[in-house]
């Protein structure tokens, strides 16, 4: 045995399925006619920012940098203005830069104000937490802040303390960690406040590792932390870090992340546990509705077009109304399964990657599977989609660009990009570039030349 | 106005009254540091700390040693506020081409009365401005209270041993044995043992880590619905190795159980049979030549409780959420002579294959994680 104490490494990860090319190499992703899509802007982030896990809508849909999101009431949800148009990806992608990271982390990069924000954890006990800001233009390190974890730092070796993706309201950054440390910084790295939520909840923690990524809506950071010891969802004041509201939750582990749900002119937040999905008013913590529903505890729900897509024994779509009206099931398809990757929805296409690495393209209105495309490897990273193309990065660190036919009836991998290291983070897309993060590096992909 | 509120307000007034230049007086700095150090849980004190933090972050680098001193007794939350400010100070100073107060930082680092985290921070700053720091200072840090400093010192020795290699195996052995004696992290311990093995020196990993390998165990007791975790079955009241108890499905009595691998794992399924919704107890004794702080370090995927000499040290009602060495640490005091360890291990009723595990490992350590010199007793 030789002292290897990674006990039962495979077993917990069966339950927790998370989510070197060099500069100048063109990957020539081919023509990517990115359409203009219905996109939500939950916070006053600038057009072209990628403010949180799975992007502006928390649904994996790419906000084309060419398109300015138009305000639509309080939720700033942009309107669909076109279905075809030029995009920054039309000429393929080339490595813009690649930089070293000081630690590991499945957390995804976010982009705000021309800065790429990344979290990492390091040290043999994973107790050193890093928040880094890189210049999106040239990749140079703008600032780095380090903190000592105040909660449990044990995780399965596959994941790391820096698993949750940070979030931003456009002015402030909120970085969350498996150890339940929540740090607020301004865009220059100045500390605004620091919360150690495990100091408030001593039994909080999961030694598999926690991964729920927070969201900002208005002046509230919504944090979901659910474990066998203690569980809660809380709204934290973005200004001073105090708790605005707090909801006790079932004491059971979940790794899903809150997602945005348009609610009239406001924005609600979806939170899941194994048997329920709820919509919460982020300003008050009032539960708008709770629906009994089998939910996966790793892949997260997302919302689009009045439907909420919930991974759980396949996929279920819930039709939501305004306010606190409980949603009504629209369809269930037990073949439309998600593995660790969360579903992506874009216009009239719904994508799910199952545990076998098969990408399923479905009609979000009916749940009908239109095509199945086998990808290489397994996926912990959630894909991003633009028009009829989808970009997914497998665990081994191979990016795969998939083109789906217009009618959705077929798909094919049109390019592969080997990054050469393990990848669990989801891509971020902003300012006409794609940012991907692996166990040791951060890459920027920029427009290149077409093959 | 309560005195606490008054204090915070006065601190805020002082903080807002002046900057923190190199010539800042001690009172001003103390006020700033106090404003930050009063942060509490649930966001308490953040407003006052925010104003103070900006002042502190703007301070001159000459103030760094004083801030490190403040870190010594700061709460874990306040420590991060202070650390954030020091990083802003250091980054600005170095970006401006300035220097750090190296003599004062080195003096601070040398004083082991300061908190390990503060000293580690001083060391990292010194490394950034003086490339000789590691070679000069690490050799004296093999027994450092800071596990990070100790780790770097051990790593330096392992590199030295590798350089000696087969050219001078006796020197390499000596260096590796010193490294092994100081190492506290499993990867370094394994590395040193493997390299010593290559040189013909066999080290027993189990003893090196301090695992208890001989146990008496009893069970199953009822834990249906997880309710047995809170039930104090007879062994929690007193351990009588000759006793029999009413168990989950009949009378139970203490039986022998041995660790089945070099990492000290004791398999309760093997010792007691496979059960679901069950609780068991494991008992062992060890001798200590003196009363001293001790840590009972448990690894188990089952819900657990730990007692030392009848005193509860630690509990975790968590099932099958990964396990690793030193997962739960019970801190206490052992006494001179015989000490009694009792562990409760609860199995739940999950039916998945991976939830069949009902086992544990436990080692007896000093507060650095080194194996306590002990004579394990067969109870």
Residue ranges and their predicted role:
Chain A
Residues 1-27:
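N-terminal secretory signal peptides that target proteins for export/translocation
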Residues 25-28, 32-33, 393:
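Compositionally biased, low-hydrophobicity segments enriched in charged and small polar residues
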Residues 30-42:
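Bacterial N-terminal signal peptides
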Residues 42-451:
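Noncatalytic, solvent-exposed loop/strand surfaces
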């Amino acid at each position: 045995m030789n002292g290897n104490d990674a006990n039962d490494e495979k077993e917990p990860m069966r339950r927790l399925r998370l989510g070197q090319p060099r500069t100048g190499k063109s990957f020539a992703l081919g023509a990517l006619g990115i359409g203009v899509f219905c996109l939500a802007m939950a916070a006053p982030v600038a057009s072209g920012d990628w403010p949180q896990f799975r992007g502006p809508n928390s649904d994996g849909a790419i906000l084309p940098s060419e398109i300015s999101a138009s305000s639509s009431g309080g939720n700033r949800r942009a309107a669909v203005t076109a279905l075809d148009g030029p995009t920054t990806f039309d000429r393929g992608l080339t490595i813009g830069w690649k930089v070293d990271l000081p630690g590991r982390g499945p957390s995804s990069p976010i982009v705000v104000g021309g800065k790429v924000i990344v979290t990492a954890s390091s040290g043999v006990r994973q107790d050193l937490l890093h928040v880094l800001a890189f210049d999106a233009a040239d990749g140079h390190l703008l600032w780095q802040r380090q903190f000592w974890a105040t909660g449990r730092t044990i995780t399965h070796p596959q994941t790391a303390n820096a698993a949750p993706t940070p979030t931003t309201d456009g002015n402030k950054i909120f970085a969350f960690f498996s150890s339940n440390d929540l740090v607020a910084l301004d865009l220059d790295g100045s500390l605004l406040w620091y919360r150690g939520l495990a100091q408030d909840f001593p039994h909080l923690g999961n030694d598999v590792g926690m991964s729920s990524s927070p969201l900002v809506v208005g002046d509230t950071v919504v944090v979901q932390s659910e474990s066998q010891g203690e569980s809660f969802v809380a709204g934290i004041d973005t200004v001073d870090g105090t708790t605005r509201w707090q909801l006790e939750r079932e004491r059971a582990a979940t790794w899903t992340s809150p997602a945005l749900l348009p609610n009239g002119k406001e924005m609600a937040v979806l939170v899941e546990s194994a048997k329920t999905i709820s919509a919460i008013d982020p300003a008050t913590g009032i539960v708008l509705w709770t629906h009994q529903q089998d939910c996966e505890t790793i892949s997260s729900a997302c919302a689009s077009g009045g439907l909420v897509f919930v991974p759980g024994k396949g996929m279920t779509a819930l039709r939501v109304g305004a306010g606190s009206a409980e949603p009504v099931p629209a369809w269930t398809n037990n073949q439309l399964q998600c593995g660790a990757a969360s579903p992506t929805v874009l216009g009239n296409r719904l994508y799910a990657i199952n545990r076998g690495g098969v990408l399923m393209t479905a009609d979000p209105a009916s749940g009908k599977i239109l095509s199945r495309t086998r990808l290489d490897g397994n996926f912990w990273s959630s894909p991003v989609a633009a028009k009829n193309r989808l970009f997914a990065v497998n665990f081994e660190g191979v990016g795969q660009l998939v083109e789906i036919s217009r009618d959705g009836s077929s798909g094919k991998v049109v390019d592969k990009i080997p990054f050469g290291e393990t990848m669990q983070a989801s891509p971020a897309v902003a300012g006409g570039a794609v940012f991907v993060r692996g166990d040791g590096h951060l890459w920027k992909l920029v427009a290149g030349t077409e093959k | 106005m309560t005195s606490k509120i008054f204090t915070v307000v006065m601190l805020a007034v002082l903080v807002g009254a002046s900057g923190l230049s190199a010539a800042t007086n001690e009172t001003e700095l103390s006020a700033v540091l106090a404003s930050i150090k009063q942060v509490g849980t649930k966001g308490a004190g953040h407003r006052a700390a925010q104003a103070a933090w900006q002042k502190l972050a703007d301070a001159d680098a000459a103030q760094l040693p004083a801030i490190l001193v403040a870190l010594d007794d700061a709460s874990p939350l306040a420590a991060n506020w202070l650390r954030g400010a020091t990083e802003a100070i250091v980054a600005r100073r170095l970006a401006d081409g300035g220097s750090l107060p190296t003599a004062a930082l080195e003096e601070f680092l040398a004083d082991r009365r300061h908190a390990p985290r503060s000293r580690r921070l001083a060391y990292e700053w010194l490394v950034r401005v003086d490339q000789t720091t590691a070679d000069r200072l690490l050799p004296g840090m093999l027994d450092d209270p800071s596990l990070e400093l100790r780790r770097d010192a051990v790593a330096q020795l392992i590199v030295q041993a590798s350089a000696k290699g087969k050219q001078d195996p006796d020197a390499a052995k000596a260096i590796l044995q010193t490294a092994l004696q100081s190492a506290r992290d499993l990867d370094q311990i394994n590395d040193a043992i493997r390299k010593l093995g290559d040189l013909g020196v066999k080290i027993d990993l189990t003893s090196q880590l301090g695992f208890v390998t001989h146990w008496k165990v009893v069970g199953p007791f009822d834990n249906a619905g997880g309710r047995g975790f809170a039930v104090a079955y007879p062994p929690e009241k007193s351990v009588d190795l000759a006793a029999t108890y009413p168990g989950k499905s009949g009378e139970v009595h203490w039986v022998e159980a041995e660790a089945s691998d070099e990492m000290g794992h004791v398999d309760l399924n093997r010792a007691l049979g496979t059960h679901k919704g069950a609780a068991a107890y494991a008992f062992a004794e060890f001798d200590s030549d003196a009363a001293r702080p001790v840590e009972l370090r448990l690894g188990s995927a089952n819900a657990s409780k730990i007692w030392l000499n009848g005193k509860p040290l630690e509990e975790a009602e968590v099932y099958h959420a990964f396990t690793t060495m030193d997962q739960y640490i019970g801190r206490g005091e052992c006494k001179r002579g015989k000490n009694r360890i009792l562990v409760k291990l609860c199995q739940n009723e999950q039916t998945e294959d991976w939830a069949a595990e009902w086992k544990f490992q436990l080692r007896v350590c000093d507060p650095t994680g080194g194996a306590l010199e002990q004579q394990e007793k067969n109870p």
